[in-house]
Amino acid sequence: MKLRQLDMELFGGCNYSCSMCPQGSEKGRERDFKKALSWLNFMKIVDDAELHGVESISLHGGGEPTMNKYFIPAIKYIKNKNIQCTTLSNGYNLDDNLIDEIIDSKIDIFKISVVGYDEQTYEKMMRTNAFNKVRENVKNLVRQTEGTNTRVQSQHLILDPEKKDYEVEQLRKNWIDYTGIDAEIWLMHNWSGVYEGKYERSKEDRRGCGRPFQPMLQVRAGGLGKHQGAVVACCMVLGNDAAATLGHLDDQTIEEVYNGEKYQELRDAHKEERFDDIP
């Protein structure tokens, strides 16, 4: 089998508790999935992915990757295999020392997640009074990576679709122009389930996304029980990882999971449009 992309979580916990994320919900993220991926399991998974011709590995998931002590060694391990490497962070830990290490790692793309267009909305959504701190961290990262292999990007979410134009204007003024960063702006995600109506999916008009048939895998740092490296259906199952687990790469190969019974059941349910049969 050919594997094009591997999304791999290094750390299942987080130093933030954002309102739109299960990390910040009353229930919180499932305990089994808040682990740090071990170095041995990380190497096993990357080596296996390399055998399947993986083109890109993104170190992100539902936690903060910089909290894994092997964050920089993980990037270097991937880059030494000539595989594209990307990560997504909240940017809080980007001090001068980490920035130097990031540049030295030669990571291809470093993405920053920022929800909120000013100090007040950032604190409301990300539940941390760190808008200015992160903004300065990222401005420094952008400046120091100029002329290097590393591209720095930010990802933002619209808080109120009715005020989209205003929010884009504020993001441009308070964030994009200030830091000099390239940015993506998306509609709000609702992983935590705390928002009403606007993003509900109609049960009368459903279709498969096609992800179960794509040459890509979504891997969590944690797993059921003592396992690590759980393969889940997609990134949108965050908060329900246990029900979405298709196998574990700490004691299975990528091919065993991808061609396994649970993965095939998921594909069959999509093909036959039996969406209520999907946990």
Question: For the regions a protein language model found, what residue spans apply to each?
Answer:
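Catalytic cores of alpha/beta
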Residues: L98-D100, P161-W175
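Accessory C-terminal segments flanking Radical SAM cores
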Residues: M1-E9, W175, T179-P279
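Anion (oxyanion) recognition and catalysis
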Residues: K79, E146, I176-D177
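Non-cysteine beta-strand/loop elements that form the S-adenosyl-L-methionine
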Residues: I102, I107-D118, A183-H189
